[in-house]
From Swiss-Prot:
Protein name in the entry: UPF0178 protein NIS_0137
Family: Belongs to the UPF0178 family.
InterPro entries membership: UPF0178
NCBIfam families tied to this protein: PRK00124.1
Pfam family for this entry, one: DUF188
Residues spanning the signal sequence: none
Organism the protein comes from: Nitratiruptor sp. (strain SB155-2)
């Protein structure tokens, strides 16, 4: 399994959580973004910088993705592509996307996008909190524990 991190908008508070997991389990990790994102120093982490442009990082993740890989992203359309390709996706707030729920999240995202495009003023996402970081850490840990059990 490879861990992919969609580097766009990755909260800094998650970087040490990710680094600890990567180092503890020696998980091959690719951070993909259009600028350098420093997660931490580890031989397990590779930084891939893509050119500027819509969905360039997303396209690179999908190109490199294998079934069962895990992608960390807050990008719901990317999560949908990951699930469709047989991968797994967790967002920054600890939501684990699956084939059972991704279409719901995508529909909600598209609904709110169309409301915003119509000129309606909507609230943006809630500020990222320590509680969100904790939920993310728990979901990542649970996913990695299931993975370790399957290896045995």
């Amino acid at each position: 399994m490879t861990l992919f991190i969609d580097g766009d908008a990755l909260p800094n508070i998650l970087k040490p959580i990710l680094l600890r997991s990567v180092e503890r389990l020696k998980i091959p990790t690719k951070v993909i973004a259009n600028k350098k994102i420093h997660i931490g120093d580890s031989p397990c982490i590779e930084m891939i910088i893509v050119s500027q442009g819509a969905d360039r990082a997303d396209d690179m993740i999908i190109e490199l993705l294998s079934p069962e890989d895990l992608v960390i992203t807050a990008d719901i359309p990317l999560a949908d592509r990951v699930i469709t390709a047989g991968g797994h996706a967790i967002d920054h707030r600890g939501t684990r996307y699956s084939s059972d729920n991704i279409k719901h999240y995508l529909a909600m995202r598209n609904l709110f996008e169309s409301i915003r495009e119509s000129g309606e003023i909507t609230n943006g996402p809630k500020p990222f909190t320590q509680k969100d970081a904790h939920a993310f850490a728990n979901q990542l840990s649970a996913f990695l524990q299931r993975l370790e059990k399957r290896k045995k």
